[in-house]
Amino acid sequence: MAAELHVELVAADRQVWSGEATLVVARTTSGDIGVMPGHQPLLGVLESGPVTIRTSDGETVVAAVHGGFISFADNKLSLLAEIAELADEIDAQRAERELERAKAEGDATAERRADVRLRAVSAR
């Protein structure tokens, strides 16, 4: 079993993160899944939620992911997201304002998106 896996986190408009990791945790339609080197091949649908990547050097990278697909084979993990942003890129105060506005307007999609962004920030 290899000690690390290659991870590509890609949004529709850009490559968000790429590198070597020892563990990736993501939310799928079947529930949360942890992928480590040597994992069985998989293909799944991503739910909106934070994705946590434990890099090979022990750092933790967290991203807010909004829908997409996850694919793993031969120690290569691809996370193809409709929207994705690293927690370090998220302005928490702006996300709080967006959450409050979405709640006031009854916009469930915007509320879910702001909530995921805030959870990613708090997980970093």
UniProtKB/Swiss-Prot annotation:
Subcellular location(s) of the protein: Cell membrane
Superkingdom of the organism of origin: Bacteria
Signal sequence residues: none
UniProt keyword Transport, yes or no: yes
Membrane topology: Peripheral membrane protein
Keywords in alphabetical order: ATP synthesis, Cell membrane, CF(1), Hydrogen ion transport, Ion transport, Membrane, Transport
A family per Pfam: ATP-synt_DE_N
MF terms in GO: ATP binding; proton-transporting ATP synthase activity, rotational mechanism
Primary localisation category: membrane
Keyword Transmembrane: no
GO cellular component: plasma membrane; proton-transporting ATP synthase complex
PANTHER family xref list: ATP SYNTHASE DELTA/EPSILON CHAIN (PTHR13822), ATP SYNTHASE EPSILON CHAIN, CHLOROPLASTIC (PTHR13822:SF10)
Function, as annotated: Produces ATP from ADP in the presence of a proton gradient across the membrane.
Family to which this protein belongs: Belongs to the ATPase epsilon chain family.
SUBUNIT field: F-type ATPases have 2 components, CF(1) - the catalytic core - and CF(0) - the membrane proton channel. CF(1) has five subunits: alpha(3), beta(3), gamma(1), delta(1), epsilon(1). CF(0) has three main subunits: a, b and c.
Name of the protein described by the UniProt record: ATP synthase epsilon chain
Gene name as annotated: atpC
